[in-house]
Amino acid sequence: MYRRPGSTLRAAKQALQVNTSISPAEVFRHLEILERQNDGPLVVQQRYFDACEAALGLMEALDEALLRPDVRLTGRLVQGHWNQSAEIRLRVHASAEEVRPVLEHLAFDPRSETMSTRVGPCTAWIDDQSPPMIRVISVPSPARKFANESLVVGGTTVPLDLDEVRRRCLKHRRGS
């Protein structure tokens, strides 16, 4: 098992400094579960790219479906240390009324919160703000119920356009 010395205590201290709906006891219990997981850095890194691949498929589908030239897609890759998750947050620069029919046409039900991807099931949902944001999240089973609690985030990229997400996925597939 890969050990992260002191990470539980450090992550818990960070997590408890953030306003959240999760109680301190739940934070510690969940972090203890993560300590027992066999998740070394390579597993977490692979999960990050799995989320990127899942998001790339959705970005490409939206790019084809939203034909208006003023609609832009950007994404931020996020890696969460506390829940060992990886996610990409897709921001669609269009109104929610335009995005919903496209998602329904792609057979993606925003209310189901789950979509099947090449890398397995991913939790996904729409954040109904303006502009709407679609988050495609790849989370291990023990952490799935905590996926919407973004407590201790390891890092966030600057906004990436579709071409940059595509380039990163291709680079990873080639093993570089």
Feature-to-residue mapping (PLM):
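Catalytic core of pol beta-like nucleotidyltransferases
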Residues: 2-85, 93-176
